[in-house]
């Protein structure tokens, strides 16, 4: 009986030795796309950079602000476990929609002096609890009653900001329950050559260093800089 068991063991060992070299080349010949398809949902992927591609910094001098209680739907990022891929993980799907009976029918357009819009996301927290402090700042010139009224209202109103980088990618700051809070700071200047106006600094806590909008918003239409497109005739 022992000899019979020993013989079976030897045969299995020989079969295994023969099979391993056959399987190894099959695995090595899988290309990157195929290997990526084997993983479901977000996973670490190479960060590549094409030499010579544009990388101009800065943001456009226009933004949108939405008070947190104004819309009934908001662009949101998916649950991390349900994101289809890495790009979807940091992409807010959906649009702002406002109730018919509400005060606001669309986002509030904000002008900012050229080259004054700034955004950064700094790491915060301790090990096993790292997140980001998103900070958005911009400058509105002047000393008008309308501006000071906006300052009075926005200082204690949480909400969402939409802004656009130099590559025309729109980003959103604030998510349901993790709204952006705004601190306005007015400076009237001292000398005649000084520029007067309000600097706005908005901050929000987030698990992401940036969130992009899946559906861009036409800021020029909202700002009244161009007419809204005519609906197609059915």
Predicted regions and their residues:
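Solvent-exposed edge beta-strands and adjacent loop segments
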Residues: 44-133, 178-193
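Short, acidic/charged, Gly/Pro-enriched secondary-structure junctions
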Residues: 151-173
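Oligomerization/assembly interface segments of phage tail-like spikes and tubes
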Residues: 125-145, 194-208
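Aromatic-patch recognition
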Residues: 118, 146, 163, 173-174
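Residue-level signal for secondary-structure boundary sites
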Residues: 146, 169-171, 208-210
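Short, intrinsically disordered N-terminal pre-domain segments
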Residues: 1-77, 217, 225-234
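Mixed-charge, glycine-accented linear interaction segment located at domain edges/termini
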Residues: 178-234
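Short, conserved charged micro-motifs
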Residues: 145-152, 211-214
